[in-house]
Design a protein with these regions (language model features):
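A conserved amphipathic helix/loop scaffold
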Residues: 2-214
Length: 214
């Protein structure tokens, strides 16, 4: 979140303080809505929530890479190293726990991912531009930790599932196929009947199906 809108950090602060799980990525909280840099340290107005201060960022040339190595007994139970490239942020923890460290270069051993307990919640930070596999694993584990319900058990590549819930408890589930061909996907139509679109076990290319239920 490079650019911060006024009031956004206060929403994040209250969300985490009241028990939310928050994930921030590298190079966040740098400028305001007019692209003016914040003074006094970054991520702006979230250093206490995140438990660290950003000190520097290393830009890598094309083809260069570093890696994040999981700390033993880390809270997310990460077991494998992941490569990172392009941008690697160097942070100085205050209260944050180190989840992963960089594997080489002059910042070998410095935090590459952190977790900070703030109020009743937790704030995680990914400090570099990692390969997609890290984000997949971390987001899956954070969703499980937060108790997020999986509406569709298996989501094929190129298919996106989102859900909106009304104040009365009615849920609308949007299933969109961004592939050039139809794909098979098992939808929970017993609980969420088809409200818009046609479904026969597959979703056509570039098609959207909307389910509705509670």
């Amino acid at each position: 979140v490079y650019l911060l809108r006024e009031g956004w950090t206060e929403k994040v602060r209250n969300f985490v303080k009241n028990g939310g799980i928050f994930l921030l990525t590298y190079w966040s909280g740098i400028v305001d809505e007019t692209d003016l840099c914040y003074l006094g340290g970054t991520p702006h107005d979230l250093m206490d929530v995140m438990g660290f201060r950003s000190m520097e960022i290393d830009g890598l040339y094309d083809g260069e890479w570093n890696e994040g190595i999981p700390e033993p007994e880390n809270p997310l139970h990460l077991e494998r190293a992941y490569r990172c490239s392009h941008l690697c942020e160097l942070v100085q923890p205050s209260t944050a726990e180190v989840v992963m460290t960089y594997g080489k270069d002059f910042y070998d051993g410095m935090p590459a991912m952190t977790r900070n307990v703030y109020g009743k919640g937790k704030a995680y930070a990914v400090c570099a531009d990692f390969e997609q596999g890290l984000y997949d694993e971390v987001c899956r584990k954070l969703a499980e930790e937060a108790g997020v319900e999986r509406i569709v058990e298996e989501v094929p590549e190129g298919v996106e599932v989102t859900m909106r819930e009304q104040k009365d408890g009615t849920r609308y589930v949007f299933v969109q196929n961004f592939n050039r061909e139809a794909v098979e996907v098992k939808l929970p139509i017993e609980r969420y009947p088809v409200w818009q679109g046609t479904y026969d076990g597959t979703i056509g290319s570039w098609k959207t199906i909307v389910l509705k239920g509670r």
